[in-house]
Amino acid sequence: MAASGWGRGCDILIFYSPDAEEWCQYLQDLFVSCRQVRSQKTQTYRLVPDASFSAQDLWVFRDARCVLVLLSAGLVGCFGQPGLLPMLQRACHPPQRVVRLLCGVQPGDEDFQAFFPDWAHWQEMTCDDEPETYLAAVRKAISEDSGCDSVTDTEPEDERELPFSKQTNLPPEISPGNLMVVQPDRIRCGAETTVYIIVRCKLDEKVSTEAEFSPEDSPSIRVEGTLENEYTVSVKAPDLSSGNVSLKVYSGDLVVCETTVSYYTDMEEIGNLLSSAANPVEFMCQAFKIVPYNTETLDKLLTESLKNNIPASGLHLFGINQLEEDDMMTNQRDEELPTLLHFAAKYGLKNLTALLLTCPGALQAYSVANKHGHYPNTIAEKHGFRDLRQFIDEYVETVDMLKTHIKEELMQGEEADDVYESMAHLSTDLLMKCSLNPGCDDELYESMAAFAPAATEDLYVEMLQASAGNPVSGESFSRPTKDSMIRKFLEGNSVKPASWEREQHHPYGEELYHIVDEDETFSVDLANRPPVPVPRPEASAPGPPPPPDNEPYISKVFAEKSQERLGNFYVSSESIRKEPLVRPWRDRPPSSIYDPFAGMKTPGQRQLITLQEQVKLGIVNVDEAVLHFKEWQLNQKKRSESFRFQQENLKRLRESITRRRKEKPKSGKHTDLEITVPIRHSQHLPEKVEFGVYESGPRKSVLPARTELRRGDWKTDSMSSTASSTSNRSSTRSLLSVSSGMEGDNEDNEIPEITRSRGPGPTQVDGAPVVTGTPVGTLERPPRVPPRAASQRPLTRESFHPPPPVPPRGR
């Protein structure tokens, strides 16, 4: 056993075992960095195994005003030592001054009530709590140990508790709950001002009352106060320099309450008046004739204005992932509001903030500090917008989670490359924007790009023309273009581009045909010539015909699977051997064939798939499905105006990413080919019409053509065939219309189509909490003591084997 800094009358005593050494050091640093607790004297008591607990050790506990017990596996193992537990029971009395911190120990692991009868009266904390929770629990324990609510309470304590609560020369204690009001709370420099302080507890006239003014850069000054009545104290404010000053009220040696007052000069007051008169929010409300002043109305107006002025093709091509991670101090600016994101965070413009986060440079602006060293998230919390602070933090964390998830899915075990980084950035930007704003035009284009590339060319040209010359909103695009894209997808037409089909019919080029210029005249004789015959393939070599191929079709596919390069559906093994590997350019946007969203789907894609299933089942026709999608899109745009709706979408996206990470071990490695209903070969069965289990139409059991098998040729069939073979995932839920943005139930079932096998349960992922909003945010949390399995009540220390700690967590 060892007690560091031993002395009588300590305020905080940290009781721990060697396996919680890092948590003890962390709490000491936390108490020193907090202005409200740093004045309290802190000691530590380290309990080592096989050590005795002497009377001197007992006095260390008795003189402490707060006993903070770090309950770890090693400490619980010491409870079985002979003669130690009774001494600890006496040391942890009275219970209101004891706080326990569970370090890898669960309340249900042991019957702690049998160890300590007052266990239920202890304050409890966990390793996942925020630093404010630790500070509040310690302050509460010290406050309750100070005596009682009123400083005039002089009733004698119970004689049984006297030996355990002996205190002399109590240091100041902060009790902010006793304060009601301070008038005035702003004091003019150089002017005599009387400050009135109203408290909740009764003050004793026989005890001297004083007020202590503590400036930040000068010594403290104590001024004698006057009791106006039992609850009111008046003091003459001393002449101090401008700035915030801490004010404490003492009744004898006991701190009754503490607050902060500010001193100001005449010039500072003039500046405050001018800044309040030129309030930008009130000015804009007046300019837009918003009477009475309403921040929510102004927020919607500015958000809609920004949406209408963004180019129709969107700004996501520029990216938003410019988060500065190195040399953060160089990003501090001299302005109070260096970016529009800081402005929106200060005045609580929530919808505008959500829209700005999807614009280029959003994360770069997030990493810029103003002249006071505050970032947009801390500015929002400072001005009372805690929900906005939480939204900004979760958005940035979700971007990082999503980018990491997509990059891992794209790499699929390959070495890291700049190409995957660029593809992950672009996919993350698009998916974040489409998830927070379901039904937007960017989502419509991206949804169609993967399924009907030929139909998206017209819309893409219109988007480029609108952004280059005459900027127009997405609603101004030609209605037939949008409708044709949606209709083609819902009908399940072939997704092969037209140029690919033309190459199949014209494999020999155009030089064999007469090229006619439409602008020039041509002779009638040339027009009346018979058409040129279709070129035939090369004649086979003379000799006997090749023997019939009796190898099953599916066997060929699996035989060629081992020869193909993993992850490339459209390049054969021959071309890989003959041609060198070509890596795409870093800034080249990924093609849709690579599934840039890594199996995840936007809300619009899921709604279109649901409607496509309904069309295939005959529930609705194509025209009705188009109308349903337009109605859903309009509804989503209206709901996107709500900040709460965007919060829910962000939460669903985070949960979806977490589920996919947990389900990844279940599916294992993704297979390269999607296996549909195999074709049976039989010499006795005639050719007949069959129906697959999940197919909506008949198919013929015929032998396939003898062509070179490629993975892409088998997998990338028409949307009607591929969707029919996989419609079992969504046919059940297709009867219901998806009415919200990121539906959690739908996302649960969106397992990649190629993943059909069932694997083991998901692996537990330990989430790291984020320390935010405290003056000690720079402190790194120590490693959590891992949880131990439930065991019987320990009798000897040999029965305890604490596991090693996990790596440190933190931002």
UniProtKB/Swiss-Prot annotation:
This protein's UniProt keywords: Cell membrane, Cytoplasm, Membrane, Phosphoprotein
Effect of deleting the gene: Mice lacking Pik3ap1 display altered B-cell maturation and impaired immune function. Pik3ap1 depletion has an opposite effect in NK cells by promoting their maturation. Mice lacking Pik3ap1 and Cd19 have severe defects in generation of immature and mature B-cells. Moreover, mice lacking Pik3ap1 display increased IL-10, Il-12 and TNF pro-inflammatory cytokine secretion upon activation of the Toll-like receptors TLR4, TLR7 and TLR9.
Function according to Swiss-Prot or TrEMBL: Signaling adapter that contributes to B-cell development by linking B-cell receptor (BCR) signaling to the phosphoinositide 3-kinase (PI3K)-Akt signaling pathway. Has a complementary role to the BCR coreceptor CD19, coupling BCR and PI3K activation by providing a docking site for the PI3K subunit PIK3R1. Alternatively, links Toll-like receptor (TLR) signaling to PI3K activation, a process preventing excessive inflammatory cytokine production. Also involved in the activation of PI3K in natural killer cells. May be involved in the survival of mature B-cells via activation of REL.
GO cellular component: cytoplasm; cytosol; membrane; plasma membrane
SMART domains, alphabetized: DBB
Gene Ontology biological process terms, A to Z: negative regulation of toll-like receptor signaling pathway; positive regulation of phosphatidylinositol 3-kinase/protein kinase B signal transduction; positive regulation of toll-like receptor signaling pathway; regulation of inflammatory response; toll-like receptor 2 signaling pathway; toll-like receptor 4 signaling pathway; toll-like receptor 7 signaling pathway; toll-like receptor 9 signaling pathway
Gene3D superfamilies: Toll/interleukin-1 receptor homology (TIR) domain (3.40.50.10140)
Sequence positions bearing Phosphotyrosine: 264, 420, 445, 460, 513, 553, 570, 594, 694
Presence of keyword Cytoplasm: yes
Signal sequence range: none
Phosphoserine found at: 642, 718
Compositionally biased intervals (Pro residues): 530-550, 801-811
The name this protein goes by in its record: Phosphoinositide 3-kinase adapter protein 1
Domain notes: The DBB domain is required for dimerization.
Main location: cytoplasm
Record-linked Pfam families: DBB (PF14545), TIR_3 (PF18567)
Region of interest: Disordered: 146-169, 525-551, 702-811
GO molecular function: identical protein binding; phosphatidylinositol 3-kinase regulatory subunit binding
Impact noted for substituting residue 420 to F: Fails to bind PIK3R1 in a BCR-signaling dependent manner. Loss of regulatory function in Toll-like receptor signaling probably due to loss of interaction with PIK3R1. Impairs mature B-cell generation
Location of this chain's protein in the cell: Cytoplasm; Cell membrane
PTM comment, free text: Constitutively phosphorylated. Phosphorylated on tyrosine residues in C-terminal region by ABL1. Phosphorylated on tyrosine residues within the YXXM motifs by BTK and SYK. Isoform 1 and isoform 2 are phosphorylated on tyrosine residues, most likely within the YXXM motifs, via CD19 activation. Toll-like receptor activation induces appearance of a phosphorylated form associated with membranes.
Tissues with expression: Predominantly expressed in spleen (at protein level). Expressed at lower levels in thymus, liver and lung. Expressed in B-cells, macrophages and natural killer (NK) cells.
Ranges where the DBB domain occurs: 182-318
